[in-house]
């Protein structure tokens, strides 16, 4: 999917409205606990201000539900951004209105302003045309660099593009499109997808779309037990989606018909309770005792999955292999992250979907060893499902 980007336009002397994803975690004192998302936007910010653009940034923060919630003000973000850039960032009192417009018009070349939380207005999430037009009136160029919200048709991601031209992708979105797009449309083979997570229901569309593209699918996470039940295996107390057993059977049959190498675990780590102190044991699939549940993939599965990953040329990973937040059940996920980093060091293109898999890679300290970690959980999932993302579709081709 080719979209015009910051490289295709001149920003000098123009007011540039850029949608960023500054939805950062705050503690109870409104201190930012992780500024990764702010740092990720810096390449696009630097480019615009170095080119002499007058930059107006906009973002949401949290879920204020269309009301002004002072604890969700973007003021701490403006402060952190000014520290990172070593330059002052004007903080607007609102994202629309006369005062914000006057502040925008007063900007000089290379100056930056951050609008207040977009979601203080209910019209943002409703993609209200009048609200989108008012946002658009502040700028002469629109840039979207918020991949994390690209799957939402909101006023600041989709509606705004109808009222300001050019509308282009920032570097972050350009990078997402490059890696995710290449994996889905023109992958180097063998192409392996690793899917984890608790529920099949959240991954049906991804599986069905990837069946048209991949050579091998490795399945982990609690959703394996619904597949095992479909195969008539005993699963003990493990999590099963009973209403999806028939669907699991259908997916197994589809993989077989299309000659896709779909690998389920051969052993799991079982425990009697969901706790860090629980006694654990590795058991073969189908051999989970009635009073126990599977909470991670086992050592034999780790070996098999790692071999598949190391033999691949392209790997896409979405979803953890077990309950990685609890130490005894994190080994499978961490081992897969390690195999992915080892494969990448040998030239494999590795792409990690946002959310839990990204968190696992960070936890393992392996982020720098991965080709691309997506910045959008929901957006990368919808991209892998083959869906159009409204915030991307609206940009200039």
Swiss-Prot record:
Oligomer and partners: Monomer.
Binding site for ATP: 203, 294, 325, 354-357
Protein family: Belongs to the phosphoglycerate kinase family.
Gene: pgk
Location relative to the cell: Cytoplasm
GO CC, any one term: cytosol
PANTHER family xref list: PHOSPHOGLYCERATE KINASE, PHOSPHOGLYCERATE KINASE 1, CHLOROPLASTIC-RELATED
Name of this protein: Phosphoglycerate kinase
Binding site for substrate: 21-23, 37, 60-63, 119, 152
Keywords: ATP-binding, Cytoplasm, Glycolysis, Kinase, Nucleotide-binding, Transferase
One MF term in the entry's GO annotations: ADP binding
Pathway(s) this gene product operates in, as recorded in its UniProt entry: Carbohydrate degradation; glycolysis; pyruvate from D-glyceraldehyde 3-phosphate: step 2/5
EC supergroup of this enzyme: transferase
Reaction(s) this enzyme catalyzes, per UniProt: (2R)-3-phosphoglycerate + ATP = (2R)-3-phospho-glyceroyl phosphate + ADP
Gene3D superfamilies xref list: Phosphoglycerate kinase, N-terminal domain
This enzyme's EC code(s): 2.7.2.3
Record organism: Chlorobium phaeobacteroides (strain BS1)
Family matches, as Pfam families: PGK (PF00162)
GO-annotated biological processes: gluconeogenesis; glycolytic process
Top-level taxon in the UniProt lineage: Bacteria
